[in-house]
Regions:
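Helix-turn-helix
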Residues: 1-20, 24
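A short structural micro-motif
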Residues: 3, 108-112, 182
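Short, basic, alpha-helical segments at the C-terminal edge of helix-turn-helix-like DNA-binding modules
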Residues: 28-32
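Hydrophobic alpha-helical connector segments
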Residues: 34-80, 96, 103-106
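Mid-protein regulatory/catalytic core that forms ligand/cofactor-binding pockets
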Residues: 83-119, 123, 129-130
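C-terminal peripheral helix-coil segments that are non-catalytic and often amphipathic
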Residues: 91, 119-186
Length: 186
């Protein structure tokens, strides 16, 4: 604020309170990534691409994650995204219940993967790797398993090599497609 020649409180001339700033920040990130403006002939591919773009946006802005609980459905950009997703789900023939369930299930899954990816990115930086490609992430996971004794945890020890090699991008796609298939069949 000093560099701009204003006080730290000057922002409140434009926003009612801290919550209003947070809502606008979340909505700005949602709007900047334009997650729904893409063409896919197949509604399943359209939906996957939309959630993959949301995931990418949140991974690029991890500071927004703590703000999602209060601000995610209140801004115009966020509401536009939600409305368009629901429109596509209904257009695909899903019932109201299925559309609502699929929207929330995919949102919860996507946010959960972002939390894990952000933690892996933070861990990679701590061990001296600034990027988060699959090889770096796998090494980081492997190192985290090697840093603790797994003898009291035989199942983790048995699966550690496989857990370290999970390809997050491929896993995200496969899981989103499986969730869509499961909800659409219910």
């Amino acid at each position: 604020s000093a560099r701009l020649g204003v006080t730290a409180m000057a922002i409140y001339r434009y926003f009612k309170n801290k919550a209003a700033i947070e809502h606008e920040l979340v909505d700005l990130v949602v709007g900047d990534y334009d997650v729904i403006n893409h063409n896919r002939d197949d509604w399943v591919e359209w939906l996957y691409t939309t959630y993959a773009k949301m995931r990418h946006a949140l991974c690029n802005h991890p500071g927004v994650m703590p703000l999602l609980d209060n601000a995610s459905y209140q801004g115009g950009n966020a509401l536009t995204v939600m409305d368009r997703i629901l429109q596509e789900l209904r257009r695909a023939g899903l019932s109201e219940r299925q559309a609502a369930q699929l929207f929330h299930t995919l949102m919860a899954y996507m946010v959960g993967t972002v939390v894990l990816m952000n933690e892996e990115a933070r861990r990679a930086i701590v061990v001296g790797k600034s990027n988060t490609n699959t090889a770096v992430t796998s090494r980081s996971r492997k190192l985290s398993f090697e840093m603790v004794s797994l003898s009291p945890y035989p199942h983790i020890a048995e699966l550690a090599p496989h857990l370290a090699q999970v390809d997050a991008e491929r896993q995200f796609r496969e899981s989103v497609l499986q969730i869509i298939k499961s909800v659409a069949a219910s």
